[in-house]
C-alpha cells in the first residue's frame, strides 16, 4: 500500500505580542487552496501549523510550532508561553534531521527539494520508483522500514528517527508508534479536494527540512503552469469535450472518482467531460458494474491504473480480463488507456506535480497513461 494505514514560540516579554497577534490570526485561513492546512508565520520567524481533521474539517487535529534548531532565543519559558497562547501543540525544532517516510510521493517531493539527506527510513520500498531514492538506500544512507501499515519499530529506533510522516485514516490507530519517543507528522494532503490544494502541502513539508523558500517557489511555478495548461485546454474549441470513464472494477464493485475528487477536477481541467462530474463526493463512489455500464456505455475514452509485473497490457490482454469490458464504446473504438503502476512513477510524481499529469492528459503524451494497442 502506497500510503500508510497508519495515519510557540517565542520569547518572554518581547514574544508575548507576536504570540497574541498569531492567536488573533488563527481565524483566518492562510492557505490559498488547501482546506486542511494553515500556516501562520509569526513576527519572530516561527511557523504555527494547523492540520484539520479530514472527517471533521472544522476541528483542528494537531498543531505544530516550527522553531529553528539554531534559535538561541528559544527556551522552556518560550514553550510555556506558546502553549498558553495557542493551546495543545507539538514543538518541532527544524530542520528535522532524520525522517521516516511511509509514502513514496513524499520521498519524490524531498528529492525535488534536494532534501533526500533528511530521509533515514523509507517504508514500502517496493513501491518507490525514484532512482535517486533507491541509490540513497543502496548506499546505506537510509533503512528499509518494512510495511507502512506496521513499520519496524526496531529499525525506526536504530535509525534514530526523530519524526514519522504518516497519512491519517479515519478510525485508524497509531498505537504501534505512539509509545515510541517519536514525533508523528500528520500528512493529510491526500484528503484535499483539488490538485493544487494537495500540492500546496509542499509548503509545510518544505519548512520541516529547511526548504521553505524552495517549496514556496516550486509551488508558485506549479500553480502558474497548471493554470496556463487549463487555459490551453479550454481554448481548444476544435476538440469536442470527450466523455470519460475512469478506473476498473474490483470484484463486484467499481470504484470511480467522485465528482468533487482531485481526479475528477483534474480530468475536467484537461478538457474531458467526466461522467460523474456532477456528483458531490470527494472520495470514490462504490458502484456496481451494471450501474457503470448504464452510464458510461457510450464513453469516448476509458483510462485506468493497473498493476502487471509481466509488462504493459495490450488491448487484447485487457479485453481478456473480462468480456464485460467489450460492451463499452471506448473499448470498441480502441480508446482505452492504462497506466501500469508496476513500472510507472504515477504515484510518486502526480500528488505534488499535478501540472505534469495535466499536461500529459492534454497532450496524450503517454507519460503515464498509454494507449492499449
Predicted region positions:
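Positively charged n-region of N-terminal signal peptides that target proteins for export
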Residues: 1-4
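Bacterial signal peptide processing site
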Residues: 17-19
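A short, structured surface patch at a secondary-structure boundary
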Residues: 55-159, 163-169
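Basic- and aromatic-lined ligand-binding clefts that recognize polyanionic substrates
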Residues: 98-104, 108-113, 214-270
Amino acid at each position: 500500500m502506497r500510503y500508510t494505514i497508519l495515519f510557540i514560540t517565542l520569547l518572554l516579554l518581547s514574544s508575548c505580542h507576536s504570540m497574541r497577534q498569531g492567536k488573533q490570526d488563527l481565524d483566518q485561513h492562510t492557505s490559498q487552496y488547501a482546506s486542511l492546512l494553515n500556516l501562520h508565520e509569526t513576527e519572530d520567524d516561527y511557523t504555527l501549523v494547523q492540520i484539520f481533521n479530514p472527517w471533521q474539517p472544522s476541528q483542528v487535529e494537531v498543531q505544530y510550532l516550527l522553531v529553528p534548531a539554531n534559535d538561541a532565543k528559544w527556551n522552556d519559558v518560550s514553550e510555556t508561553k506558546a502553549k498558553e497562547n495557542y493551546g495543545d501543540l507539538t514543538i518541532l525544532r527544524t530542520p528535522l534531521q532524520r525522517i521516516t517516510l511511509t509514502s513514496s510521493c513524499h520521498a519524490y517531493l524531498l528529492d525535488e527539494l534536494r532534501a533526500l539527506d533528511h530521509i533515514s527510513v523509507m517504508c514500502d520500498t517496493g513501491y518507490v520508483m525514484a532512482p535517486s531514492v533507491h541509490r540513497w538506500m543502496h548506499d546505506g544512507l537510509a533503512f528499509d522500514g518494512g510495511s507502512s501499515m506496521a513499520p519496524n519499530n526496531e529499525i525506526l529506533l536504530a535509525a534514530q528517527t526523530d519524526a514519522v510522516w504518516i497519512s491519517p485514516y479515519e478510525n485508524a490507530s497509531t498505537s504501534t508508534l505512539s509509545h515510541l519517543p517519536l514525533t508523528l507528522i500528520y500528512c493529510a494532503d491526500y484528503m484535499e479536494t483539488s490538485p493544487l490544494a494537495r500540492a500546496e502541502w509542499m509548503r509545510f513539508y518544505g519548512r520541516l527540512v529547511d526548504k521553505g523558500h524552495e517549496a514556496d517557489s516550486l509551488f508558485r511555478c506549479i500553480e502558474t503552469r497548471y493554470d496556463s495548461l487549463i487555459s490551453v485546454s479550454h481554448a481548444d474549441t476544435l476538440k469536442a469535450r470527450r466523455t470519460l470513464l475512469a478506473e476498473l472494477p474490483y470484484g463486484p464493485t467499481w470504484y470511480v472518482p467522485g465528482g468533487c475528487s482531485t481526479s475528477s477536477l483534474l480530468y475536467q481541467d484537461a478538457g474531458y467531460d467526466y461522467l460523474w462530474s456532477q456528483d458531490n463526493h470527494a472520495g470514490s463512489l462504490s458502484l456496481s458494474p451494471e450501474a457503470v455500464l448504464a452510464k458510461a456505455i457510450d464513453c469516448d475514452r476509458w483510462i485506468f491504473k493497473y498493476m502487471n509485473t509481466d509488462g504493459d497490457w495490450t488491448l487484447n490482454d485487457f479485453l481478456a480480463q473480462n468480456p464485460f469490458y467489450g460492451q463499452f464504446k471506448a473499448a470498441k473504438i480502441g480508446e482505452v488507456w492504462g497506466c501500469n503502476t508496476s513500472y510507472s512513477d504515477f504515484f510518486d510524481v502526480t500528488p505534488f506535480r499535478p501540472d505534469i499529469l495535466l499536461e500529459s492528459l492534454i497532450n496524450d503524451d503517454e507519460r503515464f497513461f498509454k494507449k492499449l494497442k
